[in-house]
């Protein structure tokens, strides 16, 4: 038996064509691996059978929904990760999990080569291949879409010439990637920055005006930075994301129209839908404002940004990212409590906070009777705080 190729299989055009193409061009058997990340759409058994129909000798479906939520989405929540302050890493956090399961499949099915369907223009090629280099540097990597400059038209022609059983159309306008954490849409008329998204771009979210008269108030509970309840009901991380996808999505929350800086050096326009992700990150950030000491919170905002950049850049398995997560884990010790939010008209509004770990002291903060803040200490504090400014002003202004 020739050495097998382990293919990251989505069920779409490119990876379906890749199964047949790899067999013809390399003579190697293909094992297709499809990962269920809560993306919805087609039944995964249908996807598995399609891989076999396209020529895979084996097709494996991995249910990684809970693993994805707890080991990939949760660190994103705890790091309040928004690349360029907007994008909650919808695709970026899924790639290292896919890599992990492809490497596992390679060991189990006699694979010496792993393959993906990424282009040479995007970030995902980096995320996959740096991931493979980190976990299994002995494996070879095959990237037919990138290395042989496939276009959609070429892929369709190959599928037709080789009777590959997949229904496609040259008119399909968008490239879509989705999982339970969110949905990413690009290409087509969206590549022209002045073009507004049309209704057919969206799937996870309703038009924000649909439920204009019925705002949704939700209370999210956290225990040490982990979402554990919604409106007092216990939930797993996956259940929290799924419920908030439905509720926030119904209010048009989580629509993002972004021009982002790709790792490869170009700017690209992306439309994201991430209702559950944006609500959870908003709630978690707000709870940290209540429970983290000032300097710790300030410093963590820097590490949050760096964590997001590392993940976006495909460095999930890097030493720095692991070190940052150790720091983040320490910061979550007191991030427990509840945040109340109103979801309405595409917006998230926080209107309530409570925590047994809160650093907010009512008696110190109030301006009413019972104020325990010693205002007589303020004059000396202000004098000392401004002392260096006063000294330098004397020199610089000649006073």
Curated annotation (Swiss-Prot):
Taxonomic superkingdom: Bacteria
Keyword terms, alphabetized: Amino-acid biosynthesis, Arginine biosynthesis, ATP-binding, Cytoplasm, Ligase, Nucleotide-binding
Q: Which GO terms describe its cellular component?
A: cytoplasm
Q: Among its keywords, does the record have Transcription regulation? A: no
- Which sites bind L-aspartate? 119, 123-124
Binding of ATP, residues? 8-16, 117
InterPro entries, per the entry: Arginosuc_syn_C (IPR048268), Arginosuc_syn_N (IPR048267), Arginosuc_synth (IPR001518), Arginosuc_synth_CS (IPR018223), Arginosuc_synth_type_1_subfam (IPR023434), AS_cat/multimer_dom_body (IPR024074), Rossmann-like_a/b/a_fold (IPR014729)
Functional pathway: Amino-acid biosynthesis; L-arginine biosynthesis; L-arginine from L-ornithine and carbamoyl phosphate: step 2/3
- Record: residues binding L-citrulline: 87, 123, 127, 175, 260, 272
Q: What is its EC number?
A: 6.3.4.5
Biological process (GO) annotations?
argininosuccinate metabolic process; L-arginine biosynthetic process; urea cycle
- Localization terms from the record: Cytoplasm
Q: Name one GO molecular function term.
A: argininosuccinate synthase activity
Q: Which reaction does it catalyse?
A: L-citrulline + L-aspartate + ATP = 2-(N(omega)-L-arginino)succinate + AMP + diphosphate + H(+)
The family classification in the record reads:
Belongs to the argininosuccinate synthase family. Type 1 subfamily.
Output the NCBIfam families linked to this UniProt entry.
Answer: argG, PRK00509.1
Q: What quaternary structure, including any partners, is listed in this protein's UniProt entry?
A: Homotetramer.
The name this protein carries in UniProt is Argininosuccinate synthase
Gene responsible for this protein: argG
